């Protein structure tokens, strides 16, 4: 059966002051369609770098990353950008919302760029699902931290990607908002039959996934 994602002997190295730093070493795993995976490990173990590699935001030093049978490292930048826009949604702990755009405009912009029909109503629909139906016309500065995070997630998944990459999506939130965000992500994955790879330090959140991958010193344990 074809896998949604496959990593084979992936390495990521940096040269700093003539010293070779091994960020990720011989990382191999597969992701099925509709699978949820949590990636755990200590700070600096390489978790975020893994998300960056899969999303095509970093280039592996060696090894192979295949998404739907396309080898990410062999694609041109515009081809990778196209995949990120339509097939892979990325949610970061630190995100950027356009400050002079309303919540609705921040989300609908992704649809407009991709020439999707009826972008406003589609953006309204997902924001309403995220409990922001009454905040559509608010600027980011008028939203709480949890509300801003929900807008950022809505923007990342409004194109209905097959794979969501989430890097500490609840890291800066209180327990109430953390639970809300986690419910949003897992409900979306279930409804849209998508896959999720989520980096988290929260054991309770990690255990919501079907599988847990632990990284230590750049290696999968």
Segments from the language model and where they lie:
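The feature captures the beta-strand-to-loop junction immediately N-terminal to the Walker
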Residues: 40-42
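Helix-to-loop junction immediately C-terminal to a conserved catalytic motif
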Residues: 55
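Conserved signature/switch motifs of ABC ATPase nucleotide-binding domains
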Residues: 85, 138-141, 159, 192
């Amino acid at each position: 059966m074809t896998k949604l994602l496959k990593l084979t002997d992936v390495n990521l190295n940096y040269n700093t002051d003539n010293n070779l730093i091994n960020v990720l070493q011989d990382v191999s795993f597969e992701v099925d369609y509709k699978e949820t995976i949590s990636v755990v490990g200590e700070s600096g173990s390489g978790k975020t770098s893994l998300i960056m590699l899969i999303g095509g935001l970093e280039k592996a030093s060696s090894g192979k990353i295949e998404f739907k049978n396309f080898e990410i490292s062999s694609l041109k930048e515009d081809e990778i950008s196209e995949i990120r826009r339509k097939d892979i949604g990325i949610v970061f702990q630190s995100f950027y919302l356009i400050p002079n755009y309303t919540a609705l405009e921040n989300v609908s912009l992704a649809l407009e760029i991709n020439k999707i029909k009826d972008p406003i109503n589609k953006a309204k629909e997902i924001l309403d699902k995220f409990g922001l139906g009454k905040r559509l016309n608010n600027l980011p500065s008028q939203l709480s931290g949890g509300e801003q995070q929900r807008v950022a997630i809505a923007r990342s998944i409004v194109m209905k990607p097959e794979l969501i990459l989430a890097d500490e999506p609840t890291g800066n939130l209180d327990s109430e908002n953390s639970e809300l965000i986690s419910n949003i992500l897992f409900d979306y994955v279930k409804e849209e039959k998508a896959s999720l790879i989520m980096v988290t330090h929260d054991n309770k959140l990690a255990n919501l996934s079907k599988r847990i991958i632990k990284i230590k010193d750049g290696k999968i344990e």
